[in-house]
């Protein structure tokens, strides 16, 4: 038994996920690592970021739309503020492209 945790920081966990993704196994890995509530919270966070980046709704409206508290929206908003405009554009493009790809797969 070692005296410390094998994974001690976020970058190590990201490497683990990247390695699983290279093998096409990121979905089972994340499903195993996260509880249903944690997965639901992550889906909510993705939707929060999407709505905030679109900029069409107030935080209160996003809260009502997604069924989450205003404080949850505020935390997402504060996190977004810590990123550059370029990062925000990249994320919005990724979110839009991922949604489009998902819709294309459903049509097939």
Curated annotation (Swiss-Prot):
Pfam family, one: Trp_repressor
S-S pairs: none
Keyword line: Cytoplasm, DNA-binding, Repressor, Transcription, Transcription regulation
Subcellular location: Cytoplasm
Gene Ontology terms: cellular component: cytoplasm
Superkingdom: Bacteria
DNA-binding region listed in the record: 59-82
GO biological process: negative regulation of DNA-templated transcription
Main location: cytoplasm
GO molecular function: DNA-binding transcription factor activity; sequence-specific DNA binding
The protein's role, per its UniProt record: This protein is an aporepressor. When complexed with L-tryptophan it binds the operator region of the trp operon and prevents the initiation of transcription.
Family statement drawn from the similarity comment of this UniProt entry: Belongs to the TrpR family.
Alphabetical list of PANTHER family matching this protein: TRP OPERON REPRESSOR
Subunit structure: Homodimer.
Name used for this protein in its record: Trp operon repressor homolog
Gene: trpR
């Amino acid at each position: 038994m070692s005296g410390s945790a094998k994974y001690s920081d976020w970058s190590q966990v990201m490497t683990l996920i990247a390695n699983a993704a290279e093998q096409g196994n990121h979905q089972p890995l994340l499903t195993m690592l996260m509880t249903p509530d944690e997965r639901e919270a992550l889906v909510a966070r993705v939707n929060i970021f999407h709505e905030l980046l679109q900029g069409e709704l107030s935080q209160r409206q996003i809260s009502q739309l997604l069924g989450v508290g205003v404080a949850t929206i505020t935390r997402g908003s504060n996190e977004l503020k810590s990123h550059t405009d370029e990062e925000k554009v990249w994320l919005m493009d990724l979110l839009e492209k991922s949604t489009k790809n998902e819709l294309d797969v459903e049509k097939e």
